[in-house]
Design a protein with these regions (language model features):
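Conserved acidic residues
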Residues: 9, 49, 105
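Glycine-rich phosphate-binding loop used to anchor ATP phosphates in small-molecule kinases
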Residues: 1-42
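Short, structured coil/loop segments at alpha-helix boundaries
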Residues: 28-32, 36-39, 45, 53, ...
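Short catalytic/ligand-binding loop motif for oxyanion handling, primarily in non-cytosolic enzymes
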Residues: 19-22, 60-63, 115-117
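NTP-dependent small-molecule kinase module
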Residues: 66-132
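Conserved phosphate-donor/acceptor-positioning beta-strand/loop module used by diverse small-molecule
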Residues: 15-16, 44-67
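Short, functional N-terminal and low-complexity linear motifs
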Residues: 28-32, 55, 59-60, 87-91
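Hydrophobic, well-ordered secondary-structure segments
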Residues: 1-5, 58, 97
């Protein structure tokens, strides 16, 4: 979520600066800590007001990737790219959650439709608390 500074209201971004760092790092050979350090200035200047971390257990993620009919994915389960992607997510999550200057963040589960429904409620509550 990014608050549009010049416009009243809220802007929701499905992908933001943290997603961009993860995507760049997915194909890089640099370790995640070094990569995130390199992007630190950009992250601190362009960070949204709220980062929503969406999680599911590993089995669910792997099953969802395998069930994609068109095979459209940047990495297959049980691949080096998959493992790197997971490590990158965890590295970014740890950075977001452990840095005083990082934006607010919440973790929502994405195992079931009910999880998504309660996650939407939590996101709305978080947005409301940030902007009131």
């Amino acid at each position: 979520m990014a608050h549009a500074r010049s416009v009243s209201g809220v802007t929701l971004l499905d992908q933001g600066v943290y997603q961009g760092v993860w995507s760049a790092g997915l194909r890089a050979s640099t370790n995640w800590s070094t990569l995130i350090d390199r992007f630190d200035v950009i992250l601190s200047r362009t960070a949204p007001d709220l980062v929503v971390l969406v999680e599911a257990d590993m089995k669910t993620i792997m099953n969802r990737l395998r069930s994609r009919e068109d095979g459209d994915t940047r990495f297959a389960p049980d691949s080096q790219a998959f493992d790197r992607g997971i490590r990158g997510y965890e590295s970014l999550k740890n950075r977001i959650r452990s840095t005083d200057t990082a934006p607010a963040s919440i973790v929502i589960e994405n195992e079931t439709r009910e999880d998504l429904s309660s996650g939407v409620d939590r996101i709305a509550e978080s947005i409301h608390s940030i902007h009131n």
